[in-house]
């Protein structure tokens, strides 16, 4: 061959694997093996050099002056023969078979023999199995075996799913110290302190004799001043454990004082009056009618922790009069009006993907709908009413994302566009709207078990284009248009008493406004004040019955879709 050829190092991808396969064949045929591991009276021939290369435990055993250094047989204590077989297979093949049945033996054995690859595989498997019923046990198991990443993952999971976790036996069986550690944590994700209080009471009731004296110590970590006055008087005051304890009564009195003496709140600041930080909810605003007097495709995200707005990928079609919901880490944008016609199409964004992900289409509704109401119940999306360009609808349909299919349900009693749709205690409520002739104050509710709509007490004010959201046990209706004026007024419906009360008005009139709840507060988003499109956002605190303006969006709009999503 002519010319000068430079030398080159060439690495093959199969060499190491080929050697491992050959050594495994030698092991299985007991060829060139120079040590036998004995576990539970069962012998496992092996090669010292292979064991030492994979395990610091065996490396120390065979290279130091330990008694096992030159012995042909080594007894291994603290693990079973079946586990030893799995570990040896890993040493010679790089593959480990982890199951629910073997992981509790495999992980401690991997720690004992210092097989880092097996330990990591077990931790990854357990993390994939995290569930509200087992996360506390996995956290303790991880802590016992110094699996720091797994322990942190289990801890975060228990915080994120606190209301579900406390329903399971693992929580009830915790020690007082473990309960304290969990409920004092700022990061637990709850919509209010109600599930925290109820978790403490249920834990005490499980073993009343032994645990009753622990109640005052635990109750100091429940942020009772952040509970509603009604819950304090109706639920906490009625709890026998509370009435029987002077220390508990003092904590309840502190909460009442916080509500009754607002002028003293600045002096009462402390851990019990501080909102928890763990709720990673963000607010999403999609589409709407923009400042160019046309539908828009802009999507913005608000983080209440930083009070900052950022942009997400635009929807594929410009839409006003649009509805939006979130379900299982996905954002759905439903119906609307593109400037030419009312739409039945639905777009979806998988929020578990990167923020440069793309919107994709799912099955369209059976009916074209603009200004429809949308909500979620269980694993389903419900959409009712709306305007198709020629008539207002009484119909409601339901979307099942598992089969990507819409189905028609029972009709409302009144045709409505611009109505609000919300779920409370498993019942769907439709509020206000416009029937083609009149602005409505009527409210009807749908029972999914019977498939029927019935009327409930109407609102005090006729409203179309109002924002609707559930906070604690009240449905709040904000702003809208009454046929004459754009409204700033707000009223709240008590689902227990079927009655309405008026609360403090917003600082700005808002029609075609979005409403949702974030971290225990009600948000009113953008809208139209009768003169201008708005980018401003207001936040209502039900504890002090007061609104405050928070950071404005980058886009002025009304008729937008609004939803809340929990970030990972």
UniProtKB/Swiss-Prot annotation:
Keywords: Cytoplasmic vesicle, ER-Golgi transport, Kelch repeat, Repeat, Transport, Ubl conjugation, Ubl conjugation pathway, Wnt signaling pathway. It is found in: Cytoplasmic vesicle, COPII-coated vesicle. It comes from the Eukaryota. GO terms for molecular function: identical protein binding; ubiquitin-like ligase-substrate adaptor activity. GO terms for biological process: COPII vesicle coating; endoplasmic reticulum to Golgi vesicle-mediated transport; neural crest cell development; neural crest formation; proteasome-mediated ubiquitin-dependent protein catabolic process; protein monoubiquitination; Wnt signaling pathway. InterPro entries: BACK, BTB-kelch_protein, BTB/POZ_dom, Kelch-typ_b-propeller, Kelch_1, SKP1/BTB/POZ_sf. Gene3D superfamilies: 1.25.40.420, Kelch-type beta propeller, Potassium Channel Kv1.1, Chain A. Ubiquitinated by the SCF(FBXL17) complex, leading to its degradation by the proteasome: ubiquitination by the SCF(FBXL17) complex takes place when aberrant BTB domain dimers are formed. The BTB domain is required for interaction with CUL3. Substrate-specific adapter of a BCR (BTB-CUL3-RBX1) E3 ubiquitin ligase complex that acts as a negative regulator of Wnt signaling pathway and ER-Golgi transport. The BCR(KLHL12) complex is involved in ER-Golgi transport by regulating the size of COPII coats, thereby playing a key role in collagen export, which is required for embryonic stem (ES) cells division: BCR(KLHL12) acts by mediating monoubiquitination of SEC31 (SEC31A or SEC31B). This is Kelch-like protein 12. It comes from Rattus norvegicus (Rat).
